[in-house]
Amino acid sequence: MPKLIILPHKILLPKGGVFNAMKGESILNVALRNNVEIEHACEKSCVCTTCHCYIWKGASSLSICEEKEEDVLDKAWNLQFNSRLSCQAKINNKDIEIEIPKYTINQ
């Protein structure tokens, strides 16, 4: 079973965490199921950037970043090469390590 590793975040998860994930489950759904309240203003419909995260390990095993997600990501605060929307990035067979940005456009 793949794991979602979330690096420490000052507000949402001060000590970080490791959570079991199911293949095909989005990063956001794994986090929410484990009471990590990543903001998701658009209710997972891929129109905002509040669930933006950085993928530090396992990016190649995530679902492909579709054009719509890429277009929305262009509006994200502090966009980086490893940015994904956690509502769209689906976990496959490998462990994934992410960082939740310090800020979002809504914060």
From Swiss-Prot:
Coiled coil: none annotated. Its cofactor is [2Fe-2S] cluster. It holds the Pfam family Fer2. GO terms for biological process: P450-containing electron transport chain. CDD domains: fer2 (cd00207). The keyword Ribosomal protein does not apply. Binds 1 [2Fe-2S] cluster. The keyword Repeat does not apply. Residues 1-104 form the 2Fe-2S ferredoxin-type domain. One of its GO terms (molecular function) is 2 iron, 2 sulfur cluster binding. It comes from the Bacteria. GO terms for cellular component: cytosol. Keywords: 2Fe-2S, Electron transport, Iron, Iron-sulfur, Metal-binding, Transport. [2Fe-2S] cluster binds at residues 42, 48, 51, 87. Ferredoxin are iron-sulfur proteins that transfer electrons in a wide variety of metabolic reactions. Belongs to the adrenodoxin/putidaredoxin family. NCBIfam families: fdx_isc. This is 2Fe-2S ferredoxin.
